[in-house]
Every structure is written in structure tokens, then in C-alpha cells.
Amino acid sequence: PTLILKSNETLKIFLKINLKETLLKSEDFLGLKINWDNYGHFGKINKQDFFLLNKHTKYRKQKDIKSNIVNQKLEVFPIKTSLLGAFDEPVETVINYCRDIVKEDDILVIGESPLAIMQGRYENYLNIEYDIFSKFLCYFFHPTSSLATASGMQILINKLGFTRIIISLIFGFIFKFIGIKGIFYRLTNPESSLIDDISGTIMPYDKTIVLGPYNPKLFCKKLSKALKIDVAVADVNDLGGVKILASSNKSIIKLLKIALKKNPAGNADEKTPIVIVRRKA
């Protein structure tokens, strides 16, 4: 069908898909790829989206979980899941995976990118319409930065506006000249530091740009209430960097920075987006 949408208007599409029973039995998840055309004053642009339909037939049990010793007082349990997608309600999904595993006084941590993916906060790089400004501004960043590509920079411009980006860059240059680094990211946080460019995420999301999660504080509050334990959302890398985006209890942040320093969830294709931190008796 062809539809006319006004600026900033939302279109909801309901699909009914008939699948063979043999296919459902043999696969743990299915991919739904949608191709569509965007037509307007700019001409025609071919776009595509990808969604994961997950069956979640293999929830983990306590006996399946392997412990990693952090020190004499802490151990961590990476929780392996199926591939997560935008059709997985975040709180309900994590509860299903962890309710038979967590114990009293445990702390549950989920990565910021898996949470953002379940919230549908990712975009195919082919759908991003970048302009001359984003192509120019991305050259001011380190080649490995997610803002060092026109698409990554355009995402940030779309979120914060061109004016704020320019002002932040100017102040960043001024302060860097006198020996103070990181001002740009301070002025554009949290959006700028949470963008993961393509190849920064597990397949099939390695061709998408993942934004930071929406309202992680509320997610922590809901999940903490349901499981009766503390919950946190973290951004962790293999270099020992640990950033706690949100938590149900601020007093656990110092402990989490110790427990997560070696990145027990991993940054490759481990499929362990959830980590249980447990205090040893």
C-alpha cells in the first residue's frame, strides 16, 4: 500500500504471518526483513528494517550457569540468552531468563546495547540520510570512534541538533588547547558516548547503529521490584572501562565497577548480555 504521512507522524503496521510448524520447531528465532520506499520532495529513497522474532525456548537453569571468580568476596555469572530483538519486552524477557537463577542480595546487570535493541533503538545505516556537515564533522574524531563516520555523526546531529554539536566542538577545541580533554563528550552526554556504530554489535545488528537505551532508570526500578534484587544498566568494554548508566541503588556502583572490570559479558558474540553479581558468603 501507499500512504501519505505528515512530518513526525507515526505509522503502525500490523502483520499476520503464517509459518509452517516444522519451521517453528527447527529454529529458535526468525528474521523479518522489511524493504520500503520513502518518497517526497527529496525524490525516492530505498530503505530497509530488520526485526528478530524470538521463540525463547531455552531459558537457563541454575545448573547451566558457570561462575567467574572476581575476588574473595565477589563472583559473577554471565547469563547466556537467545538473540534479543525489538519484539522482546525488556523487563519480561529478563525476568524469564533470571527468575530461577537470582538469589537474595544478588545484583543483576544488563548491557546498554542489548537493552536498547529490545527497545527498538537501532537504525540500519542504509536508512540514515547524512549531509555535508556530518561528513565534515566526523573527521574531527578518532578513526575508531562511533562518531568518526558520517552516519554516526548524523545520528547525533538528529538527536541534539546541529547548533549544540558545533558549540560543543568549539568548546572542546578550546579546552583541549589548554590541556583539558573530553569536554565535547561532557557537553553532549549521554547521547554521544552511547552510540555504537556498525560492527560494534553482535550479528544481525552489525549493520545497524545502536543508540543508548531509553529511560534505563525506569527499567532498573521495574525489574528490581519484580525480582526483589538490585539492578543496573552498564556500558563495559574490554579495556577495563565500566560506566553505570542507571541503577536501582546508587550504593552498588562502586562494587559493580570492581566486579565488571574484566568485562565478564564479553564484547564479541558470547550472547551473554546479562551478568549476575553475587557476594560470596
Residue ranges and their predicted role:
Residues P1-A281:
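N-terminal and secondary-structure boundary signal
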